[in-house]
Regions:
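A short alpha-helical cap/connector motif
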Residues: 1-165, 169-193
């Protein structure tokens, strides 16, 4: 009988060293995010960059919605795997980080594939619903307090064979610790049920 391999820092480093190399602009985004202090935690991991790339490469979605842009690492990771006629729409309320993301998209020469909506996510989602937009893939990685709302509303935007990816559902492993009563941990735990 086999058992699951625990992924520690050594294993993670080994995987990173033997995986697909990041696009130079992905590396730049990561270096930029390193200067942001605690906000860096909003960034997806390198493994997630590879995962999002792989998902878009394998499933070839034509239309992607991302809820939560930050500085654009996840958008760029998905965009690199897309075919030429595919598009990403990404929503974020933060004008400053959205501008940073836009600049990185231009640098990577993918800005024509990515539309940024600067608005509260609920407003942006509702506008897309009113426009009857439909997406093959929806990636949710925004404020955790509204995950349930984003998830429920996303079904109004999802194509029949589409799928939803939700980041942070394990919340760095915190959700399994029943003694952890931190606010965001409880929200994620509730979302998962």
């Amino acid at each position: 009988m086999s058992s699951n391999l625990p992924i520690n820092k050594q294993i993670e480093k080994y995987i990173d060293e033997h995986s697909l190399k990041l696009h130079p602009v992905q590396d730049e985004i990561i270096k930029y995010n390193d200067t942001l202090g605690k906000k860096k935690k909003l960034q997806i991991s390198i493994n997630q960059c590879h995962f999002l790339y792989l998902v878009t490469k394998l499933f070839k979605p034509k239309e992607i919605l991302e809820i939560g842009t930050f500085t654009g690492l996840s958008s760029l990771s998905m965009c690199i795997g897309l075919e030429n006629n595919s598009k990403i729409t990404t929503i974020d309320k933060n004008k400053d980080t959205s501008l940073v993301a836009k600049n990185f998209f231009e640098k990577a020469k993918v800005s024509e594939k990515i539309d940024i909506i600067i608005d509260e996510a609920i407003n942006g989602i509702n506008k897309l619903i009113s426009q009857k937009k439909l997406f093959d893939l929806i990636f949710i990685d925004a404020d955790k307090e509204n995950y349930k709302k984003y998830y429920e509303l996303s079904f109004n935007l999802l194509k029949r064979d589409g799928f939803i990816i939700i980041d942070n559902v394990l919340w760095h492993g915190e959700v399994v610790d029943k003694n952890n009563k931190e606010h965001l941990t409880e929200i994620i735990r509730d979302f998962n049920t």
